[in-house]
Amino acid sequence: MRKLPKVAYFCMEYAIESNVKLYAGGLGILAGDYMKEACDNGYPVIGIGIKWKQGYGEQLIDKENCRPYDAYVNRYYDFLKDTGITVTVRINQRDVKVKVWQYDAHGVNNLYLLDTDVDGNDGDARWITGQLYGWFGEERVAQEMVLGIGGVRALRALGFEPDVYHFNEGHALFAGFELIREKMA
């Protein structure tokens, strides 16, 4: 039997379970199904994503005026395992600490989530992983730097050496830059 390549799968969102708000829609559903299938079949795949503090906004209807509005609530996931790993990413002239959590529930244990809401980061840095697609401009670039650069550094700290890097959409582009930086060092 041929050896399967080890794959690192980078994505901004994952839908593993509907009440775990780490996704917005189709991209997350695809990524979540991919991770679940890989885990079920024992494929050597690790997912890298973001531990969103508030996830994607929920649209609710104001009962009084019958108007829609977006609601954001802080979410806590007690099933995430602390890996004990923290990596650092330089963003806007400052070092941002990025904690690595293992998603270990709902039949998935091969997904690692990155979190900047940790002690030692200033308020702006803590909110980088606040809302999925909640900002544009510099904030979005910071989120993508955490996913890409932080993701590659997390893989190294976890001891996982992929044969293939899959970037689901352009959000993980900074992972490519980090891989180039490693080769040039």
Give the ranges of each region predicted by the language model.
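Catalytic cores of carbohydrate-active enzymes across secretory and cytosolic contexts
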Residues: 1-185
